[in-house]
Amino acid sequence: MMAVVDNALANDYTVLWGTDVSEKGFSRTKAIGIVPEADLTSMSGTDAERWGKLSGKEKEAALYKFDKPGKERVITQQMRQEAFDNYETTDDHGMQIMGTAVDQAGNDYYKVKNSWGVRPPYDGYYYFSRPFVAYKTMSVMVNKKAIPAPIRKKMGL
């Protein structure tokens, strides 16, 4: 799926995208979607000590502040399937992926045109991290020419 999305954008096609925006990792006011890594065992020293003293509610608030780039989860097909099977991921919104962007920490994002009209802070555009798109995508629709050749061949297109 991600190969199709990336190939479409690399070849000047947009992607119609069905996703789940009822997630904690999606902020309408900040116009961003992320999947923060909650298992921060790689922390050391004072960071680990400070994190260890936070309550569960405080940890969640820190993860979803949306104030700076942070570490995100590595998404697997098993995670996607489990989220679908237990109804954690549902198809509740459609948008159009227009392009890509990179944040100040070098993390990849997709620039997405929302159907809610022109709204701040980015005039109706939102930025979804690569892990968010990999995790919460329900469907994509692309021009068949946007599909990578090996996949097109397997599909008989």
Regions from the PLM with identified roles:
Residues M1-L157:
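Active-site signature of cysteine proteases
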